[in-house]
């Protein structure tokens, strides 16, 4: 059985505190990796926290079961259940925000995450693993993988990946979509 959404929210809120404790280091990493001015890197962190708070605040409502109108002889209901392993493939240009969208939504929904960050900003993925991969009560929720598009395609071909969230280039998208289609 998966923990209730309310418990996931609290566990993930605690995990996100890593980003606050490491705020200046993360901003400096973004600046070093991308050449962004430090002020812009700090602003991305501000946006990151706003987005995270929105996802945390809306999770219980968004993931609540939905009862649909009755049809004679049927009780209809939509339940949001975890898929399993979600492979989040993230772009480089907003290394925190783009990753957060897929990572936090997947974790809130009760999934585990394999994160492949863009090679240009791969060290940012280490911060996600430090925050979400080492939660004492839920170890291994997130693993950061260093992988080429080809390697990512090979991972997708395997049945251990249950869902893929991709943000990136057209070339990367093509490399990722071919193996996904071959799974059927």
Question: For each of these PLM feature ranges, what is it?
Answer:
Residues 1-75:
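N-terminal Rossmann-like NAD(P)+-binding subdomain of aldehyde/semialdehyde dehydrogenases
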Residues 66-184:
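Rossmann-like NAD(P) dinucleotide-binding subdomain of oxidoreductase/dehydrogenase enzymes
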């Amino acid at each position: 059985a998966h923990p209730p959404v309310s418990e996931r929210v609290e566990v993930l809120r605690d995990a996100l505190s890593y980003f606050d404790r490491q705020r200046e280091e993360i901003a400096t990493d973004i600046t070093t990796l991308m050449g962004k001015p430090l002020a812009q890197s700090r602003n991305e962190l501000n946006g990151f926290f706003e987005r995270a708070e929105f996802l945390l605040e809306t999770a219980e409502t968004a993931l609540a079961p939905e009862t649909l109108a009755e049809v004679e002889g049927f009780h209809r209901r939509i339940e949001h259940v975890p898929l399993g392993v979600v492979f989040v493939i993230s772009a480089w240009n907003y290394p925190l925000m783009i990753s957060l969208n897929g990572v936090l939504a997947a974790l809130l929904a009760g999934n585990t995450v394999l994160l492949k960050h863009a090679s240009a900003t791969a060290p940012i993925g280490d911060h996600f693993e430090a925050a979400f991969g080492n939660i004492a009560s839920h170890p291994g929720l997130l693993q950061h993988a260093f992988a080429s598009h080809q390697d990512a395609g090979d991972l997708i071909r395997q049945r251990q990946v249950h869902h893929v969230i991709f943000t990136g280039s057209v070339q990367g998208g093509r490399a990722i979509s071919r193996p996904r289609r071959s799974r059927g």
